[in-house]
């Protein structure tokens, strides 16, 4: 059997409502030499049976069923089974835009890049706005990731040469930001990365999705991932240490914003620790948004606890 050119990996957990549209968005692509790996991660809503039905209707759709192990394990299962020269990741509640595969494949071939990425859209709102096609070489991709370039947030919305993935896998012990860390590890291999000025991915906001879940201690992975990135930069890219410190500082700031929304005193010691870290590292802050500047001011001028108190009052009043 001839190997497909592109392998599309879709982790699916209780996504029965969204899978038909997701699969149809792949089937509607201009480029038709693909395989679609549906990884049923122990679904309990009938998603597994639907994967089998979709496979029976289209031989390019390949279902795989496993016990629930999380999105990273599901994506890794897809990587182990893909046969394509190129790989894409697509979430089960999202869709590829028309022409996605053709645009990304053309960009890779025209530039000799290893990773191609494009814009995403949520309803009528378009994210990720490169003004025109751009190419990163060497450390530029690592620098872009540390600087929060919007095309480095996620594993989806991209086409990868299978060779650049190699033996890199999603970390199963990371539950938040696992896909940005996966992409960061690929960028540390210093591949050529091309960004295209085209909307190629539709991101759908699902209230029960992993990225929309209520606060839990898995969010501690936000600064854990930042620490992992910092260690890699310290070891392999010392010239980017300033950018890495700024990245880590922003992760601490982000974590404090999440903690401010948590009632009670359960995380008070962690809040104190992070406030000390932010104050000590504020000299490395690189201004990016007015909102970020204001939040840093709050955190470094003794205003965090008044902000927290006011937030909790407003939250209770709104119930």
Model-derived regions: residue spans:
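Short, well-formed alpha-helical segments that are part of the catalytic scaffolds
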Residues: 14-28
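Acidic helix N-cap motif at the loop->helix transition within catalytic regions
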Residues: 18-20, 45-54, 60, 95, ...
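A conserved acidic beta->alpha catalytic loop
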Residues: 25, 32, 40-50, 67
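Glycine-rich, basic loop-to-helix element that forms the pyrophosphate-binding segment
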Residues: 66-82, 103
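Donor-binding/catalytic cores of nucleotide-activated saccharide
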Residues: 71, 92-194, 201-217
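Short aromatic/hydrophobic "clamp" motif used to bind/position activated sugar donors
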Residues: 87
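Catalytic core of nucleotide-sugar-dependent glycosyltransferases
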Residues: 199-206, 212-240, 251-283
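Membrane-interface aromatic/basic loop that binds lipid-linked glycans or pyrophosphate carriers
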Residues: 261-319
